[in-house]
Amino acid sequence: FAVLMGASRAFYGKYGDRISLDRFMVLSSLLCIASYLGISLLGMPQLSLVCCALCGLSVGIMWPGTFSKAAAALPKGGTAMFALLALGGDVGCSGGPTLVGFVSELFGGDLKKGILAGVVFPVLLLLGVALCRKGKEE
């Protein structure tokens, strides 16, 4: 997970000037959705483990991409904007696992059900990128 997350960030760092951030984030969101579905629905633990690694690849750009998009959209956002982004990140880093844990507990400790519920987060990111695109076009 961590190695592929770092590889994703390094790839975008090297080739980002040639790649659309929106497109990269959309493709990463789709890969993240697919990896969450694979983790939660595949019956072979080995394939679920591969999906966990792919999840790392898919999430690598999400946090730095969000910062880049925010800085581009609000160039005078300053310290307050980054403080709010950090707060949002903290809420997400605690809220996501909390949701997964609650759903898992509702299903008798079935972590696969919790991970399946967690698919809502990359779906929300996908919707957010689409809304930003739509707002930019108008």
Label each region the model flagged.
Residues 2-10, 93-94:
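Residue-level signature of mid-helix packing/kink "hotspots" within the transmembrane helices
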Residues 119-138:
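Multi-pass alpha-helical transporter architecture, strongest
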Residues 20, 42-43, 75:
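Helix-breaking motifs and short loop linkers at transmembrane-helix boundaries and internal kinks
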Residues 15-16, 100-109:
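Interfacial helix-cap and linker-helix signal at transmembrane-aqueous boundaries
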